Amino acid sequence: MAKKSSIEKNNRRKRLTKNAAPKRAKLKAIIADKSKPMEERFAATLKLSEMPRNSSATRIRNRCEITGRARSVYRKNKLSRIAIRDLGSRGLVPGLVKSSW
């Protein structure tokens, strides 16, 4: 089980990213637009750099919904390999069958 603080920190980052996404996208569009004057693009770059670091989507860590584990998490299920194995052995994951050959 991951520390509660790590899980909460990641949830805070998700909320911040969701709230700041439109503003970040607008600033990035201004920066990428070469037809805009250099001063305006530079001002947008400064505004973007003043925004909180945690409002960037790259700061979000994929974590297991059950355990909070950060490594070996399947994106499709949002579960770690350990949680999938545990739930699968109990028959709680539809379509998951233990392999044997």
Swiss-Prot record:
GO terms for cellular component: cytoplasm; small ribosomal subunit. InterPro entries: Ribosomal_uS14, Ribosomal_uS14_bac/plastid. It holds the Pfam family Ribosomal_S14. Disulfide bonds: none annotated. Keywords: Ribonucleoprotein, Ribosomal protein, RNA-binding, rRNA-binding. Residues 1-10 have a biased composition (Basic and acidic residues). SUPFAM superfamilies: Glucocorticoid receptor-like (DNA-binding domain). One of its GO terms (molecular function) is rRNA binding. Residues 11-24 have a biased composition (Basic residues). GO terms for biological process: translation. Residues 1-24 are annotated as: Disordered. It comes from the Bacteria. The keyword Acyltransferase does not apply. The keyword Ribonucleoprotein applies. Belongs to the universal ribosomal protein uS14 family. Part of the 30S ribosomal subunit. Contacts proteins S3 and S10. Binds 16S rRNA, required for the assembly of 30S particles and may also be responsible for determining the conformation of the 16S rRNA at the A site. This is Small ribosomal subunit protein uS14. It comes from Rhodopseudomonas palustris (strain BisB18). The gene is rpsN.
